[in-house]
Amino acid sequence: MKQFLRLRSKLFLILLKNMKPIYTFTKNWLLSLFFLLLLTASVFADQNDVRLAELFRSLKSTENVSRASVFESKIWHIWMEHYDPEVESAMFQGVEAMKLQQYEQAFGHFSLLIKLAPDYAEGWNKRATVLYLLGRFKESEADVMRTLELEPRHFGALSGQGLIKIALQDWTGAIYFLESALKINPHMYGVIMNLKYARQKQKESMT
């Protein structure tokens, strides 16, 4: 656990220096988002936590950007939590591999995590992220859909599926998933920009 906390501190400093604009469609952006979400991680719950319902209601209803950011961070905090030390270890090793851009190794660690905790939504979401970075979009889609089966409110997975659809130039699919993400969390500027991009590309494809 101490190693995990030290890693989060190091990642925060790296992120402050190197974070890319959220609306760019690059591997660096996705890694920046991944590590940003990691900063609020703990180890004692998951997507079934009873605190989430009220947080989602507050996130959707607030018009205050600062408050929305707080609610969103709390949701990610809970999603990242888990009680099992083996799951925690697999998550740590997967994150460490991603930090070194060792995506195949990260895939192995997150696959072990999924084997240990097949009903832990964030495990599937993390492996989906690695698969996206490896360019294995169809496999990434499958893991995203499993994430959504376990946590239908996972706006991160929905927006991630939107990015996959953009990569595949499936503009209709991209629009659907990005809109779905914004229905749950309407405050994601990067997703709003991605949606505008997908709509523009769809319009161009029809002319």
Give the location of each predicted region.
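Bacterial N-terminal signal peptides
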Residues: 29-40
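N-terminal leader/linker segments that initiate helical-solenoid repeat arrays
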Residues: 43-92
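Terminal, low-structured helical/coil segments at or just beyond the last alpha-helical repeat
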Residues: 50, 61, 70, 77-81, ...
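Alpha-helical adaptor scaffolds
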Residues: 84-156
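Register position in tetratricopeptide repeats
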Residues: 99, 133-134, 167-168, 200-204
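Residue-level signature of tetratricopeptide-repeat
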Residues: 127-128, 161, 195
